[in-house]
Amino acid sequence: MATPGYDYDRDIPAGFYDEIHQCKAGVRFFWHDLKFRAVAKRLDGVGKVLDVGCGPGTFIGNYLGGVECLGIDFSASQIDYANRRYGTAEHRFSTQMLASLGERFDAITMIELLEHLPPADARRLLAEARGLLSPQGRLVVTTPNYRSLWPLIEWGVNRVSRVSYEQQHINKYWRGRLAADLAQAGYAKVEVGTAVGLAPFAAVFGRGPAQWLDAVERSVGHLGCGNLLVAVARP
């Protein structure tokens, strides 16, 4: 399941997003850091996590210490990178497909994945993941919120970045549509919120301003208009 006409192994080098994270500063770092923190917060207390579309392993390696994790991705080069940098007995990375795992998980994450898939493939993936959750498990999904400032941000990124979201993002969600797809996939309890407002852009002035603005935005729940949707769904 890949974006038609887009070659991830060719256009996104192994470790590309992890190298952004290693900088620990700047707009792009804070964007991904706030996103990962929003997901990790929703995994509090879980015992075993599957990260679908894990890329170079940044989320597992930096935010899920002490948690048994498996990260999977179709890109062999990204998985090779993840194993070299973050692989341990506790943190495993593989190119296995969902159907071949044969394991149950307390939580499954899909971080910035669904927007890259054709709608039918995305719905099928959500349904397959439900079958791998433990009875009390949870699925945590993030995807851009196309009823926020995200379309404007995406337009700008497409003109200054080596990565073209115009080519990558073929499946566009808003709160109601994501909730509907999760319900259609068989999830009984679905909550969709938002995260990541304008705080990352304050990072041009330093870490302090970005952290301050993030605290303000979180205190008002991003007014429901954060640039990312964050859904928690239970089987």
Describe each PLM feature range.
Residues 123-135:
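A short glycine-rich, Lys/Arg-flanked "PGG" loop and its adjoining helix->strand segment in the class I
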Residues 29, 154-158, 180, 190-235:
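A C-terminal cap/extension of S-adenosyl-L-methionine-dependent methyltransferases
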Residues 161-177:
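Acceptor-substrate binding/catalytic loop of class I
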Residues 140-160:
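Conserved class I S-adenosyl-L-methionine
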Residues 58-61, 148-151, 199-202:
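Short catalytic/ligand-binding loop motif for oxyanion handling, primarily in non-cytosolic enzymes
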Residues 69, 189-190:
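Hydrophobic anchor at the start of a short beta-strand
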Residues 115-117:
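A short His-aromatic
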Residues 1-103, 107-111, 120-126, 195-197, ...:
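Conserved N-terminal segment of class I S-adenosyl-L-methionine
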